[in-house]
Structures are given as C-alpha cells and as structure tokens.
Swiss-Prot record:
Native organism: Pyrobaculum islandicum (strain DSM 4184 / JCM 9189 / GEO3)
GO cellular component: ribonucleoprotein complex; ribosome
Family listed: Belongs to the universal ribosomal protein uS11 family.
Designated name of the protein: Small ribosomal subunit protein uS11
Quaternary structure and partners: Part of the 30S ribosomal subunit.
Presence of keyword 4Fe-4S: no
Function as written in the Swiss-Prot or TrEMBL entry: Located on the platform of the 30S subunit.
Gene designation per UniProt: rps11
Amino acid sequence: MSATEQPQQQQQKLRWGIAWIYSSSNNTIITITDLTGAETVARVSGGMVVRADKDKPSPWAAMQAAYKAAQLALARGINAVHIKVRGPGGYGMKVPGPGASAAIRALARSGLIIGRIEDVTPIPHDTIRPPSGRKGRRV
C-alpha cells in the first residue's frame, strides 16, 4: 500500500439526541429528544412493556423499555445520545431507582453511541417542608 492510497473508511454521520431516564421506586420512564429537547422522538415507560403493576420498577422492564425507545430513535435517524439520569429528588429519594443502570446498559447494547452520562436529580440546597406540614402528621 503506497502513501497515496488510503483505506476507504465509512464515516457515519452522527445525529445526536438526549436520552432522559427518570427512574423511581414505582416506574422507569425513558424519553429520547433532539439536542434542544424541543422535539420528543420516543417516550416509553416500564408500564408499557409489562402486564403486572408490580413489575413496572424492575430492571427487566427498564431494559425492555430502553430497547424499544432505542429502536424508535434509530428509526427516526438518531444514532448517538447523551444520557441524563434523574431520580425523584426533592422530598423523595435522591438516588435513581433500580431500573436506571439497566436502562443505560440496554441503550448501549442496542446500537446507540453513548456520549455523556449525567445525573440531573433535583436536590434542594436548603430544606423543604415535608408533605405533612410543619408540626408533622398527627394521628
């Protein structure tokens, strides 16, 4: 091979999107948007892929939902995503639920190129009033 010959490289044009993963103790919701966040490409939840309500927060349901969302995104032309993971936050859990890591792995295995993974759980910088009010729940 001479210096003037270069191998033919297939340069795939990357079309980026954002995968928003909201994972609580009750469900996992995966939304894929364009980079601006204005146009929703795919929205799938754990409850859409399982029959029983008790299976909605499971990692298996999150994995199936992520596969389905990835197929919809690939069909619309998005082949690379940045991932933003969110837990309930506020007065609830500060960490994502059990389906978050399974959904990230499923997005990576489904053929999407993964860019950044970021945690965007809303965390209060002071305290917030609990749902039962100032003096607590009186039974």
